[in-house]
Every structure is written in structure tokens, then in C-alpha cells.
Amino acid sequence: MNLPITNHDLSSEASAKAESPITPASPLTGSCPLPISDYREIVLAHGSGGKLSQQLIQKIVVPQFRNELLEPLHDGAIFSLNGARLAFSTDSFVVSPIFFPGGDIGKLAVHGTVNDLSMCGARPLYLSAGFILEEGTSMEDFWRIVLSMREAAAEAGVTLVTGDTKVVDRGKADKIFINTSGIGVVPDGVDIAPGRARVGDKVIVSGEIAVHGMAIMSVREGLEFETEIASDTAPLNRLVESILAAAPDVHVLRDPTRGGITSALTEIAQTAKVGIRLDEVQIPISEEVKGACEILGLDPLYVANEGKLLAIVPAESANAALTAMRTHPLGSKAAVIGEVVADHPEFVTMRTRVGGTRVVDMLSGEQLPRIC
């Protein structure tokens, strides 16, 4: 299948520079690598997890810090220290509202970093937390969020060991922002990275998509449904342990948060230089979420998830991985939704319900700002 479409992988220019050794940063005397005529300021879409996020990272951030640990652009850095393989990750959370059906910003902050470590195949151990508080924020709200973080950490089996707190003037933040970082141990024999997807691999999703994003949007828009849409935020480390026990040769794991499953799979396709073909009929989505997306004019393929994962697994291990998922409470609705193909490298296509084929690319704009 030939796709006369521009390749949106922006890493080629930066990759050319990677051959030279790392040197101290020089003064920034050149021009900004993103055309000022396009964006003179940061816009919300730069945080969407789509094309503008990718441009921001690949064009401005990565070239200044390029190194072998950063290069894979994984959910975390994986490195060896005194004989142990460790994973290190960080994430920031600005979700609005800070309390929502199924969770709050504190629970999300713990789960998010636990899950990023888990997508590296690591067993999460320790977290840090940084709080940016707006003057005037309710002390009761802050207390509830801290208690929620404690409960989430206990559920995930991790310990919060260090942190920081800052307070800014009224109007200089929106109640509370949280950053969490984490470290975990990668077991021997586990080798998971976005560049390891291979032709013939199966693509599995652990459950119904787009739940978290629509839980947030339902609150924002005041939508009421017969069954409340609650966020799927959850720690995925135990699920990952079950998957790896059944299928230790898993190639890729990814939690499809901002930008949804489409953005996550496009990043994998670009990194591994492969194509990915999805089957729309096989993608699990609840009727409530589907209805909410239709009301708001949103495509669920691009809506954030916080308690789901994508696994790319060799075909011979797919049944074992799928069975392991379905026997775990967080993977009971897991499904094989596609495969890795040699056609259309670096692109994701989807066979539609009516039998056609369409390209599903990253969004350029912002569907859902401040979703996590």
C-alpha cells in the first residue's frame, strides 16, 4: 500500500548531530529551530501529546541534551548501576478539575509515574513529589490530595521518599500542580523499548479506551449519563508483572495517555520504522464513552487513557499475553486490535467498520487540554 503522505518523524535532523560526542552547551546565539512565523508563543496544543508536542521536544529540547539514555524517547531512561538495571522517569500533572469521577490529581500523579516505570518493564520502588500550590487553595483540598497519594502509593507498592513544595501568588497557577519522579528495577531478561516492534507482532490493548479523557470532559461540560463515566486511572505494575510472567519476550509496552492510542502507536511506528495496521471493529470502547465522544465531536482514538496499556508482542506469544491480561482485573476486556506490518513504515492505518482503510495520524491541534 503506497501512502503519498509526508513523514512527520522529526528526528532526522537531530540524529545527524548525535554522531558527535556530547559537549557543553554553547550560548544560544542562533535562531529558534521552530519557525516563529508559525508559533511565537507556546500554545495548549504543544502539550497535547500530538504533532506539536513532538516538534517541541524533537526540535528544541532533545538537541540540547542528546545522549544515549535520552535517545530512545521511552517512558523512562533505562541504565545500569553497580550491576543493577534501573529505570528512571518523571511526569507532571496539571489536570482540571483536580477532583473528578474515579480519582483526583494526587492519585493520577502517583499512578502516572508508576505506569511510566512499568512501561519500561521495571518494578517501581520509590517516588518523589513536587507540589506547586496557588495561594488561596483550600487546605482541605490539599489534605485530601495528599491522603489520596498515600493510598495510591500503598496500592502500587511504592514509597514516596522525597519531595518539595512551592507556593505562588493567586492567579499564577490553578490550585495545584504536581510533579512526580520515580525509580524502579528492571528484571533480568526484560528488554522493552519502542524501537523493538517487529513485523508480524500483534498489538494488544488492555481494555476499553478513552475512559479517562471522557470522565474529565463530562465533568467540564456538565454531561450526565445513565451510567457515570469514571476515570480508569490505576497502577499498571501488577498487570505488567502478569504479562511478563506469561510472555517475557514482549517487545513494547506503552500507556496511551495524552493523544490516545493513535499518538502512542504512531510514535512506536516512527521509532521502530515499521507500519502498524489496526482493525476498528476489534478496538474495545464502552457505549457511554462512545456516546460522550459523539456528543462532543471527539474521536476516541485520540482521547487519553490512564489505566490502559498497549502491548506489542511476538505473534507466538500473543495468546499467552492476552490470557494473562484477561485474568487480571485491569485487563479483563483486553483485545488484539492490530499487527505490525512492513507496509507504510512509520504510519498507522486502520481498517474501518465499513471495510475501508484510513491513515490515523497524530493530531496537530488540541482535543482535550489539561487532561492529565
Regions found by a protein language model. Give the residues of each.
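Helix-biased detector of long, well-ordered alpha-helical tracts
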Residues: 2-13, 18-372
